[in-house]
Amino acid sequence: MFKDFFNRSSKKRKYLTVQDSKQNEVPAGIMTKCPKCKKIMYTKELNENLNVCFNCDHHIALPAYKRIEAITDENSFVEFDKGMTSANPLDFPGYQEKIEKDQQKTDLSEAVVTGTAKLDGVQFGVAVMDARFRMGSMGSVVGEKICRIIDYATEHRLPFILFSASGGARMQEGIISLMQMGKTSVSLKRHSDAGLLYISYLTHPTTGGVSASFASVGDINLSEPKALIGFAGRRVIEQTINEKLPDDFQTAEFLLEHGQLDKVVHRKEMKETLAQLLKLHQEVKKDA
């Protein structure tokens, strides 16, 4: 009897896991973590704060359409060339699949959104790059869309504002992507020769071929705080010159101190600053 008792109690017990159907789950996208200080915030409140962290003031990437909404008069934006998409001119393996994946993820056709809008009643041409799409890299379509809106602004005598956010030229398009550096610069030269205003607004990050072309040749060059701006990477430069670079090298504040920017503007002051600049440089209409 006692032998049977101890034998039964020594047998391994089996447990059954019961799923809790009432388990509370946080809906996807309701919270956002700051990439710098790691603070978790309500996404809705963060969006209302223009994606600026409440804790550390870090300027989190702002999607193209959100930025356009933040700087324009309500319902004044008219988009150009919305359906234009990249082909695969070099038959680069996997390139088309990556483009389609980014299109689904971002609801964008390419890495830049262009069009016309008004700010305090002043009409202007605008292009806004979005680093979520192929890291904002500049390929044939990005260059073409930017050139088209610049040429439209030149023809209709409009000021032009461009927000850059890019990792540089798109490697999958090779020399075709590099050609966009010269192509966009030529369109900007015609715009400048017409006596029209070009405001370049550099956001994080603006690097490579974009920083070496249209992003750096504005009549007025602005940037957001702490934005990374440069051509080659920090490590590449240090290895090339065999010197240690300053800690704040390639930041917006460093460029401002060395005369390469006109002003570093907090995102909450972005709309007001642009409105003032557009009004100050507004073309005076001559009497007939």
Curated annotation (Swiss-Prot):
PANTHER family for the chain: ACETYL-COENZYME A CARBOXYLASE CARBOXYL TRANSFERASE SUBUNIT BETA, CHLOROPLASTIC
Per UniProt, residues of the CoA carboxyltransferase N-terminal domain are 30-288
Query: What are the alphabetically sorted keywords of the record?
Result: ATP-binding, Cytoplasm, Fatty acid biosynthesis, Fatty acid metabolism, Lipid biosynthesis, Lipid metabolism, Metal-binding, Nucleotide-binding, Transferase, Zinc, Zinc-finger
Q: What does the organism's lineage look like at the top?
A: Bacteria, Bacillati, Bacillota, Bacilli, Bacillales
Zinc finger (C4-type) stretch: 34-56
Kindly provide the name given to this protein in its UniProt entry.
Acetyl-coenzyme A carboxylase carboxyl transferase subunit beta
A GO term from the CC aspect: acetyl-CoA carboxylase complex
Question: Quick check: keyword Transmembrane helix in the entry?
Answer: no
Give the organism the record lists: Staphylococcus haemolyticus (strain JCSC1435)
Among the GO biological process terms of this entry, one is:
malonyl-CoA biosynthetic process
